[in-house]
């Protein structure tokens, strides 16, 4: 609009200087209209091409019908609000855990707000140790939240089974929890209910335990300059500052300290016969290492617990500093990541050659890479990502990309002696500009999966059809201008303005994209 106003102003100025064009004639009107339309097209094109892509943009309250899309297999668990059902996608065959929440139990306004806030937070969070939300929909009786199946069960059950953990295993677990919390706090999100019941193990593989933080019902956005006041949480894990009604994001660190204490000893630092007694002990902040279980625990481990359980939030260690604590670095320094070399070679090739500037193709691939892949399909890529993520915060910055890229080339068997740092940096900068789809200066986990995965794996008919249906909201068999505008958050625009944007894909020039055009676009991209 600013450009259009400027154009009209310039023409008025020309008239004032004696340039007596007759804008009242039909030719003048048409010329101005054509120029205005041209500018509008350019604005739409620029807005579209500069739009930021995030996995959360694909999670919308859709019109999916549960029994048409999914087949329920068995109940995985029950809670006060509903149940979790192991379900199979009828189109792709993939299995998901679907949380089914009865609307009878979400009658209060605050309960519905809590549910919708949880969905919004999960839409924005993209981290290897945070549960992934695939879909959210509702019908007359229920809300449905679709996520991965984490077959390893709760960390709580693993604690009961093991009694207590070796230091190295406890460090591996708490490092992942802190990685997720560091990422959350960096994005101004506080969990407020961290406990072993809300930490799931991705698989039953005890050698390579990957954890997932779940249940964001009590989570919220926070501001560093403001204290929170809601007294919420679970007795054993709640921080004293929460009980006092004035706290910040470091309430999560207190909970991590309690979890680490339990992992190493098998018992909570603040115990009691009932909730009242437990909370009274939490309020004092006093605990002890004078237990038989702690006699063989290192001073460094105890030091981290002490720093996490500092009574005053201002002097309590931050998530970032806890993640970099000497004990965690020492315990996890020898963790070897065995990377499959063929997978590594393919991922490096895919990363280097990802140069698509077609925003629709990028969006389709991001959806397929982040929402239509399974844990097994991304297992090797997850290892590569973790190896590159040197500071463990779940994102790759420029420096990590430079170091990690060189390491991966060596692992692949390439001779890097002739590659100077400047050449590596140039290549990394090109990679970063190509695959940083949300333009935040980091490579998120889903962005990495999207560009590194075997794209031919993604292009099954079932996956292509599901991706197409995401864009084709009205089920007409074609993706319209307004459907794209909705998805990219650009508002209603005229179809004419979108023809310029879509011309690379729209082969028959009808102003819409059919399935064949959509499929051809992705096949062309994957053939480099």
Curated annotation (Swiss-Prot):
Residues 350-386 are annotated as: J domain. Calcium-dependent protein kinase which acts as a sensor and effector of intracellular Ca(2+) levels probably in part downstream of cGMP-activated PKG kinase. Plays a central role in the host erythrocytes and hepatocytes infection cycles, sexual reproduction and mosquito transmission of the parasite. During the liver stage, involved in sporozoite motility and thus in sporozoite invasion of host hepatocytes, probably together with CDPK1 and CDPK5. Involved in merosome egress from host hepatocytes, probably together with CDPK5. InterPro entries: CDPK_Ser/Thr_kinases, EF-hand-dom_pair, EF_Hand_1_Ca_BS, EF_hand_dom, Kinase-like_dom_sf, Prot_kinase_dom, Protein_kinase_ATP_BS, Ser/Thr_kinase_AS. Its cofactor is Mg(2+). May interact with the pre-replication MCM complex prior male gametogenesis activation. The gene is CDPK4. ATP binds at residues 76-84, 99. The junction domain (J domain) is composed of 2 motifs that maintain the kinase inactive. The N-terminal autoinhibitory motif acts as a pseudosubstrate inhibiting the catalytic domain while the C-terminal motif binds the EF-hand domains. CDD domains: EFh (cd00051), STKc_CAMK (cd05117). Belongs to the protein kinase superfamily. Ser/Thr protein kinase family. CDPK subfamily. Residues 70-328 form the Protein kinase domain. The active site is at residue 193. It comes from the Eukaryota. Ca(2+) 2 binds at residues 436, 438, 440, 442, 447. Keywords: ATP-binding, Calcium, Chromosome, Cytoplasm, Developmental protein, Differentiation, Kinase, Lipoprotein, Magnesium, Membrane, Metal-binding, Myristate, Nucleotide-binding, Phosphoprotein, Repeat, Serine/threonine-protein kinase, Transferase. Ca(2+) 4 binds at residues 506, 508, 510, 512, 517. A motif (J domain autoinhibitory motif) lies at residues 350-358. Ca(2+) 3 binds at residues 472, 474, 476, 478, 483. This is Calcium-dependent protein kinase 4. It comes from Plasmodium berghei (strain Anka). Residues 1-16 have a biased composition (Polar residues). A motif (J domain EF-hand interaction motif) lies at residues 359-368.
């Amino acid at each position: 609009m600013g450009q259009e106003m400027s154009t009209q102003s310039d023409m008025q100025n020309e008239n004032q200087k004696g340039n007596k064009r007759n804008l009242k004639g039909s030719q003048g009107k048409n010329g101005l209209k054509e120029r205005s339309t041209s500018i509008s097209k350019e604005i739409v094109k620029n807005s579209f091409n500069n739009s930021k892509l995030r996995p959360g943009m694909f999670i919308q309250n859709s019109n999916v019908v549960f029994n048409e899309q999914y087949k329920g297999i068995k109940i995985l668990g029950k809670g006060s609000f509903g149940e979790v059902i192991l379900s199979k996608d009828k189109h792709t065959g993939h299995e998901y855990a679907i949380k089914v929440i009865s609307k009878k139990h979400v009658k209060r306004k605050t309960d519905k707000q809590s549910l919708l806030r949880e969905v919004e937070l999960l839409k924005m969070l993209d981290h290897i140790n945070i549960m992934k939300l695939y879909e959210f929909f509702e019908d007359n009786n229920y809300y449905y939240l679709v996520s991965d199946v984490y077959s390893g069960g709760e960390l709580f059950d693993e604690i009961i089974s093991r009694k207590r953990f070796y230091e190295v295993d406890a460090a591996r677990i708490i490092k992942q929890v802190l990685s997720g919390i560091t990422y959350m706090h960096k994005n101004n999100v506080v969990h407020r209910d961290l406990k072993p019941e809300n930490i799931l193990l991705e698989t039953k593989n005890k050698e390579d335990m990957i954890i997932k933080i779940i249940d964001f019902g009590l989570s919220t956005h926070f501001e560093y300059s403001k204290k929170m006041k809601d007294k919420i949480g679970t007795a054993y894990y709640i921080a004293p500052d929460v009980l006092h009604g004035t706290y910040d994001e470091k309430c999560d660190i207190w909970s991590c300290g309690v979890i680490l204490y339990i992992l190493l000893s098998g018992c909570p630092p603040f115990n009691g016969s009932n909730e009242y007694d437990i909370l009274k002990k939490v309020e004092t902040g006093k605990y002890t290492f004078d237990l038989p279980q702690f006699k063989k625990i290192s001073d460094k481990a105890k030091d981290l617990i002490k720093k996490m359980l500092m009574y005053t939030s201002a002097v309590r260690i931050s998530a970032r500093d806890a993640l970099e604590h000497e004990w965690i670095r020492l315990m996890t320094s020898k963790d070897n990541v065995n990377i499959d070399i063929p997978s590594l070679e393919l991922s490096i090739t895919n990363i280097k050659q990802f140069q698509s500037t077609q925003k629709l193709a990028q969006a389709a691939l991001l959806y397929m890479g982040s929402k239509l892949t399974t844990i097994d399909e991304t297992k090797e890529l997850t290892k590569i990502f973790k190896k590159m993520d040197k500071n463990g915060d779940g994102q790759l910055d420029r420096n990590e990309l430079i170091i990690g890229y060189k390491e991966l080339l060596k692992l692949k068997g390439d001779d890097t002696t002739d590659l100077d740092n400047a050449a590596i940096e140039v290549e990394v900068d090109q990679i970063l500009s190509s695959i940083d789809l949300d333009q935040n200066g980091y490579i998120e986990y889903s962005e990495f999966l999207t560009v590194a995965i075997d794209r031919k794996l993604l292009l099954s008919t079932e996956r292509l059809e599901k991706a197409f249906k995401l864009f084709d909201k009205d089920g007409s068999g074609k993706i319209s201008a307004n459907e794209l505008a909705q998805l990219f958050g650009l508002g209603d625009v005229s179809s004419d303005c979108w023809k310029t944007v879509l011309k690379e894909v729209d082969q028959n020039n009808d102003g819409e994209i059919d399935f064949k055009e959509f499929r051809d676009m992705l096949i062309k991209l994957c053939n480099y």
